[in-house]
Amino acid sequence: MDYFRLAEKFLREMHAKYMKRVSRPGNTPRPWFDFSEERLLSRLFEEMDELREAVEKEDWENLRDELLDVANFCMYLWGKLSVKNIYDKGEEQ
């Protein structure tokens, strides 16, 4: 499997995890818009702690799941910072 196919599979898994999370009542479909940088960082660190626990327990199935959570929160924070940068420069979306 080449890099592109691996990245595509990972992105599909991230999206499935995202959809599972945002379909719950009360969850926002756009955390990169609706949450502050501080809240996104806090949630990212929580997910990293859960990832660390999965590694320590050698729980490989849960480790895969936690990697998706960390990746999603990295993307949400990246999106927040990117959108903020666009607005700070006065550019359109």
UniProtKB/Swiss-Prot annotation:
SUPFAM superfamilies, sorted: all-alpha NTP pyrophosphatases (SSF101386)
Keyword set, alphabetical order: Coiled coil
Pfam families hit by this protein: MazG
Domain of life: Archaea
Coiled coil: 36-69
Protein name (record): Uncharacterized protein AF_0060
